[in-house]
Amino acid sequence: MRPNYDPRVDQASTTIGLVSAVSDSALALSSHRVRRDTLTIHEPQRDSLLYVVSGAGSLTIEATSANLAEGSAALVLAGEQARVELGAGDLVILQATIGPEADRHAPLGPREVVVDVDAASASQATGARSFRALFGPHNGSTRATLFVGYVPPGRAPWHYHLYDEIVWIPKGPGRVLRRDSEDALEAGTAFRLRPREVHILENSSRDREMVLLGVFTPAGSPAAAYLAEE
């Protein structure tokens, strides 16, 4: 659930693995804290979806440059080299990587490099839940969808998805319930949900919305959920 090994530290940045790669999944998740200068993102065979947790800076891919701020996301395709430059203060970025074995969705729109969560359209999910799709087939990410989800107090019924997913929680409290386990969701918690894994995601607050960041493959709609027996 939480990082359980020491970070790799150099003079400019710290990298922590949050959800490690496994043999039967195309997804992995890590966190970068940029302290000074620049961070280079380059994955020869894996697409990268970035999300800014805190701080500000800029991202450059070849001749394209865009500003980064808290709540913005970026797409770096396999083989591209992106340069992240630090603004004021530390810059904390999540990096989800997607391997070439992931099925590719047909593109549904032109590629974007950086998007802001406030500019993404809001859509309804199960019950009163909603989400904003940051990246997906609509803007260049054909192997995975990256979204921010909004969970009101309470819980959804037992359900599952057909996609493989990693979820990161910026702020709790909450719980993820599986048929045979229950885990607390606190700030910085990250976990994996396998295809068809029956679960409940609960917001334990009485009066505050819980926010989550999710990435899944194959790309599609976060609203695609299927009810399971109680």
Question: What does each of the following model-derived ranges do?
Answer:
Residues 1-40, 69, 89-143, 226-230:
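A short, N-terminal "cap"/entry segment at the start of jelly-roll beta-barrel domains
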Residues 78-103, 142, 186-187, 195-222:
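Ligand-binding loop in jelly-roll beta-barrel domains
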Residues 23-25, 60-64, 87, 152, ...:
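Short strand-coil-strand connectors
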Residues 130-163:
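A mid-sequence, solvent-exposed acidic-amphipathic segment
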Residues 44-59, 148-152, 160-176, 215-217:
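Short, conserved beta-strand element in jelly-roll/cupin
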Residues 63-81, 180-196:
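Short acidic-glycine-tyrosine-enriched beta hairpin
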Residues 38-44, 85-86, 155-161, 202-204:
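Short histidine-centered beta-strand/loop micro-motifs
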